[in-house]
């Protein structure tokens, strides 16, 4: 009898340092902190086993399949510099383990039960290499960067947005008024806050109607295409699609979804609906910090960003580097490139563990949002470049003269920065000077400069390599 019962070390089956990775494998880089006394090879192999074909004991049904064909393999382990008893374990998964076009299934395997595993004290997924063969099974973003620019007829600069505040408590009509004022003043977009769904003080249908009116009116008056991210997130997928259908009937350009609280299944359904019906899709990452903020456990945001590009979204919030929400510059730019570019080289200094080829999957616009104001504009323009959305909530609505002047101040600041950059000036060095010059001929900008000249929201960076 070939079957031998009992418990054997994972590393005998799942640690294979001689393995040559295939182009079709999904590759994962895990930061593993083993329990005291557990050797790194065993911990790495345990991760590979528990996230693929393994279980805690030998089972006779193993003989009914080819483990060699289907098992995950830990093929390389390296210590983490500056940390004791922490290792990066590289695991290769055969493509056959995953359902086509399902981020849900991919995550259920790779970041499922294994994170509660006793032999590992902590576990963090740092990066994933999605092979081209798997990428091709996803639709990806409904439209992507180029199509969005063509729909909006806006080129050569970042787009400007604003989250309507106070985020909860306004009636639909007052909310619509704030939307109109911001768009009329010069913003491209306004945004529902992520927690605005359909509450007693403002039901979704009323909000959609008043915001649509604000869009039509501001478009007619400015001659520019405007949008408001109508949050379609709901308690059920059916209700979510119902809201997206209503948005389409109002002929608005864009809807919004909270992809982590809503879930990848709902998000992918909405992305498919948006592509089929010409709606852009703005994605908010509420709940990401629950998953990505701990350095040694959870999942890095670059993995959540890659997963979103597969699942589908045209915009996603990606930190600011300069505002109230954290994000280290090089690391942030690493996953911003993973969102926008077609091909990204491995670069460990930016936290990118694998070369990623997106094979023409559309790109996603990164959104910088949270605690930013006119003085940040030169830095944001320089860091994020043209293909981005810069969102000023308090930085628009907090203007001493009101919402429309707040929008004017931001638009003037942005246009001044883009013009200066195109003339070859150094935004990093001359940023303050550029804003000061522009404020001489824009009283709205001058007032904004005065209000926010002393504001600093800076703490020690937490996301380090």
Swiss-Prot record:
Mg(2+) binds at residues 191, 193-194. Its main location: plastid. The disulfide bond which can form in the large chain dimeric partners within the hexadecamer appears to be associated with oxidative stress and protein turnover. GO terms for molecular function: magnesium ion binding; monooxygenase activity; ribulose-bisphosphate carboxylase activity. SUPFAM superfamilies: RuBisCo, C-terminal domain, RuBisCO, large subunit, small (N-terminal) domain. It is an enzyme of class 4 (lyase). Binds 1 Mg(2+) ion per subunit. The record marks 324 as: Transition state stabilizer. The keyword Magnesium applies. The modification N6,N6,N6-trimethyllysine is found at residue 4. It comes from the Eukaryota. The active site is at 165 (proton acceptor), 284 (proton acceptor). It catalyses: 2 (2R)-3-phosphoglycerate + 2 H(+) = D-ribulose 1,5-bisphosphate + CO2 + H2O; D-ribulose 1,5-bisphosphate + O2 = 2-phosphoglycolate + (2R)-3-phosphoglycerate + 2 H(+). Keywords: Calvin cycle, Carbon dioxide fixation, Chloroplast, Disulfide bond, Lyase, Magnesium, Metal-binding, Methylation, Monooxygenase, Oxidoreductase, Photorespiration, Photosynthesis, Plastid. The keyword Chloroplast applies. GO terms for cellular component: chloroplast. It is found in: Plastid, Chloroplast. Substrate binds at residues 113, 163, 167, 285, 317, 369. GO terms for biological process: photorespiration; reductive pentose-phosphate cycle. Heterohexadecamer of 8 large chains and 8 small chains; disulfide-linked. The disulfide link is formed within the large subunit homodimers. PANTHER family: RIBULOSE BISPHOSPHATE CARBOXYLASE (PTHR42704), RIBULOSE BISPHOSPHATE CARBOXYLASE LARGE CHAIN (PTHR42704:SF16). RuBisCO catalyzes two reactions: the carboxylation of D-ribulose 1,5-bisphosphate, the primary event in carbon dioxide fixation, as well as the oxidative fragmentation of the pentose substrate in the photorespiration process. Both reactions occur simultaneously and in competition at the same active site. Belongs to the RuBisCO large chain family. Type I subfamily. The basic functional RuBisCO is composed of a large chain homodimer in a 'head-to-tail' conformation. In form I RuBisCO this homodimer is arranged in a barrel-like tetramer with the small subunits forming a tetrameric 'cap' on each end of the 'barrel'. This is Ribulose bisphosphate carboxylase large chain. It comes from Ulmus alata.
């Amino acid at each position: 009898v070939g079957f031998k019962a009992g418990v054997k070390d994972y590393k005998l089956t799942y640690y294979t340092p001689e393995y040559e990775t295939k182009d079709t494998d999904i590759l994962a880089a895990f930061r593993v902190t083993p329990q005291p006394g557990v050797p790194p090879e065993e911990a790495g192999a345990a991760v590979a086993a528990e996230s693929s074909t393994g279980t805690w004991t030998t089972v006779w049904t193993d003989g009914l399949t080819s483990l060699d064909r289907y098992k995950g393999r830990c093929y390389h382990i390296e210590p983490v510099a500056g940390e004791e008893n922490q290792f990066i374990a590289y695991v290769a998964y055969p493509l056959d383990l995953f359902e086509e076009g399902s981020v849900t299934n991919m995550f259920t395997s790779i970041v499922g039960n294994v994170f509660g595993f006793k032999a590992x004290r902590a576990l963090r997924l740092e990066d994933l290499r999605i092979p081209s063969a798997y990428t091709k099974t996803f639709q990806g973003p409904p439209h992507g960067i180029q199509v969005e620019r063509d729909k909006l007829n806006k080129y050569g600069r970042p787009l400007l947005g604003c989250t309507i505040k106070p985020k909860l408590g306004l009636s639909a009509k007052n909310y619509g008024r704030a939307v109109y004022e911001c768009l009329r003043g010069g913003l491209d977009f306004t945004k529902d806050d992520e927690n605005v769904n359909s509450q007693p003080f403002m039901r979704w249908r009323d909000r959609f109607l008043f915001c649509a009116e604000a869009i039509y009116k501001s478009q007619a008056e400015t001659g520019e295409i405007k949008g408001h991210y109508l949050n379609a997130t709901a308690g059920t997928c059916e209700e979510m699609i119902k809201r997206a259908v209503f948005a389409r009937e109002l002929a608005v350009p864009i809807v919004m979804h909270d992809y982590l609280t809503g879930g990848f299944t709902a998000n992918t359904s909405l992305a498919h609906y948006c592509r089929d019906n010409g709606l852009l899709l703005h994605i908010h990452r509420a709940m990401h910090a629950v998953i990505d903020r701990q350095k040694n456990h959870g999942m890095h945001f670059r993995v959540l960003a890659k997963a979103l590009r597969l699942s589908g979204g045209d915009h996603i919030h990606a930190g600011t580097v300069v505002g109230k929400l954290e994000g280290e510059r090089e690391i942030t730019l690493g996953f911003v490139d993973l969102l926008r570019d077609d091909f990204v080289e491995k670069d460990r200094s930016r936290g990118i563990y694998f070369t990623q080829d997106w094979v023409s999957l559309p790109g996603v616009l990164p959104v910088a949002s949270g605690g930013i104001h006119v003085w940040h504009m030169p830095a944001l323009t320089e860091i994020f470049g043209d293909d981005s959305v810069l969102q000023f909530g308090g930085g628009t609505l907090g203007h001493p003269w009101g919402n429309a002047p707040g929008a004017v101040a931001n638009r003037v600041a942005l246009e001044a920065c883009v013009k200066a950059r195109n003339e070859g000036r150094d935004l990093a060095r001359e940023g303050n000077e550029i804003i000061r010059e522009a404020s001489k001929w824009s009283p709205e900008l001058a007032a904004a400069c005065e209000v926010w000249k002393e504001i600093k929201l800076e703490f020690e960076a937490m996301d380090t390599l």
